[in-house]
Amino acid sequence: MTAETILLSLHLSAPELILAVGALVLLMVGVFSGERSGLVVTGLAIVLLLASGLWLLFVPAEGLAFGGVYMADGFSRFMKLVALIGSLVALFMTMGHARENQLDKFEFPVLLVLATLGILLMISANDLISLYLALELQSLALYVVAAINRDSLKSTEAGLKYFVLGALSSGMLLYGMSLVYGFTGHTHFTEIAQALSVEGARSLGLIFGLVFILAGIAFKISAVPFHMWTPDVYEGAPTPVTAFFAAAPKVAAMAMLTRIVITAFQPVLADWQQVVVFISIASMLLGSFAAIGQKNIKRLMAYSSIGHMGYALVGLAAGNQTGVSGVMLYMVIYMIMTLGTFAIIMSMRRKDGTVVEDVNDLAGLSATNPFMAVVLTALMFSLAGIPPLAGFFAKYFVFVAAIEAKLYALAIIGVLASVVGAYYYLRVIKLMWFDEATGEFARVSSALRLVFGLSGLFVTAYVLIGGPIGGAAELAAATLF
């Protein structure tokens, strides 16, 4: 590599370099800043994430870096901005609640920055090896974050369960990659696509490799049948950590899955489409039915998340440009709805400081905290896909893509699953507005109020402000085709 290509590579990967160098600086600051290290490092971590996002926004650069293993294009830029917003909001939400969740250690924001670095690299990965390394960087940070509350048995259990199942999924992914490399002789996505375009290149071993890769990535997005870790980890991990898990890593994994199937495996679309359709249907149905009996609101959100990943996969199964832009839009709307809901869950504490997570504790919320009740009602209606809220448009675009691809059965099952899924969202609304209050919540912090207030505003005003976001998603999706 010449000096010119090295400089070009560094320029293209500047958002990641900001986080990588910044994380090392944060470690030094944390060691030398005494008792207030947690707060200082969290503030600096937010500045780092902002700097990375602003670079992406105002210094658009496209091209291949580091010998073609890193791709900077419109798709990666869009998804990175979404993921950075998710990380930024999740970190901002922890600031007022760090001590009670054992998150006041300076290592926590550093781990979040390292996980976000892995997330950005995952989105730009253009090679099987760079994809795996980025995925592991993100995963290793998240394993520690899940178990960071050492005084909580549930948190420790969540971290251990996530680690064991995560290691299993990484092994499946790596085995799939080795099969694909063995049958094509390449690890670059574009070269894999060229090798698969040759007549007779599609062999049984290659299809096995593809299935293993899809299985490994399905674990990361909590898709059925690789969802087992999600309810336990969501319930056991500290709530600010769960909010992060539900946002940025899901965006990155979905972006990674989209890039690999559209760029590398487009010539064998008929093969991976069947697998994605199955995973999508299973996720939608399990997410809708399993959430009905849940009492813990974090477990309910875990099954809701599984269902939503199923809906997003409807767009990916279509395998067309409309589907990809639908997936991108779905992830934006899903992330904002989820972060808003978790901001409200973090606000569920009694005046004596007791944290409550039972759905029934929301009873009578409209009488004790009308603003929170109104926002949560809007978010629940949006998660259920009720028009004219943002969640309706998210589902509408992926179903339209499925119909364009003649996947009529998939679209019909998706609509029916939405109807079933609406039950548990409406149950929460009924509790808030029609049941007697069981007690008042403590005063909500201004940070959380800001997050859920803006989320509620977004889902209700999406019909007016959604045009530019949809247009940006379409332009970004076009770069993959």
Swiss-Prot record:
Q: Where in the cell is it found?
A: Cell inner membrane
What highest taxon heads this organism's lineage?
Bacteria
Report how it sits in the membrane: Multi-pass membrane protein
Name the EC number(s): 7.1.1.-
Q: Which UniProt keywords apply?
A: Cell inner membrane, Cell membrane, Membrane, NAD, Quinone, Translocase, Transmembrane, Transmembrane helix, Transport, Ubiquinone
Q: What class of enzyme is it?
A: translocase
Q: Name one GO biological process term.
A: ATP synthesis coupled electron transport
Under InterPro entries, the record lists:
NADH-Q_OxRdtase_suN/2, ND/Mrp_TM
Q: Name one GO molecular function term.
A: NADH dehydrogenase (ubiquinone) activity
Primary location group: membrane
> Which reaction(s) does its UniProt entry say it catalyses?
a quinone + NADH + 5 H(+)(in) = a quinol + NAD(+) + 4 H(+)(out)
Query: Which ranges does the record mark as transmembrane?
Result: 12-32, 39-59, 78-98, 106-126, 128-148, 163-183, 204-224, 237-257, 272-292, 300-320, 326-346, 373-393, 407-429, 450-470
Task: Return the GO cellular component terms, semicolon-separated.
Answer: plasma membrane
**NCBIfam families per the UniProt record, alphabetical:** NDH_I_N, PRK05777.1-3
Assembly with partners or alone: NDH-1 is composed of 14 different subunits. Subunits NuoA, H, J, K, L, M, N constitute the membrane sector of the complex.
What is the name of this protein? NADH-quinone oxidoreductase subunit N
Q: Which organism is it from?
A: Rhizobium etli (strain ATCC 51251 / DSM 11541 / JCM 21823 / NBRC 15573 / CFN 42)
Q: What is the lineage of its organism?
A: Bacteria, Pseudomonadati, Pseudomonadota, Alphaproteobacteria, Hyphomicrobiales
